[in-house]
Amino acid sequence: MTIIFQLTLFALIAVSFLLVIGVPVVFASPSGWTENKGTVFSGVGIWFLLVFAVGILNSFVI
């Protein structure tokens, strides 16, 4: 169970890093928001899913 928690936590950190870099780039480009709106929303949805998964898995690890 610990390895699943660690992999999920790593995925959360990786997605967070990608969103921190990617979202400002999307907003800075001239037509980036209209073209990449779905990608940004997908990334945010995955981020929320991973936050809840880490919270649930944390109760099993500790």
From Swiss-Prot:
GO terms for cellular component: chloroplast thylakoid membrane; photosystem II reaction center. It is a multi-pass membrane protein. Coiled coil: none annotated. Keywords: Chloroplast, Membrane, Photosynthesis, Photosystem II, Plastid, Reaction center, Thylakoid, Transmembrane, Transmembrane helix. GO terms for biological process: photosynthesis; photosystem II stabilization. It is found in: Plastid, Chloroplast thylakoid membrane. Pfam families: Ycf9. The keyword Transmembrane helix applies. InterPro entries: PSII_PsbZ, PSII_PsbZ_sf. The chain crosses the membrane at residues 8-28, 41-61. May control the interaction of photosystem II (PSII) cores with the light-harvesting antenna, regulates electron flow through the 2 photosystem reaction centers. PSII is a light-driven water plastoquinone oxidoreductase, using light energy to abstract electrons from H(2)O, generating a proton gradient subsequently used for ATP formation. PANTHER family: PHOTOSYSTEM II REACTION CENTER PROTEIN Z. HAMAP family: PSII_PsbZ. Belongs to the PsbZ family. PSII is composed of 1 copy each of membrane proteins PsbA, PsbB, PsbC, PsbD, PsbE, PsbF, PsbH, PsbI, PsbJ, PsbK, PsbL, PsbM, PsbT, PsbY, PsbZ, Psb30/Ycf12, at least 3 peripheral proteins of the oxygen-evolving complex and a large number of cofactors. It forms dimeric complexes. This is Photosystem II reaction center protein Z. It comes from Oltmannsiellopsis viridis.
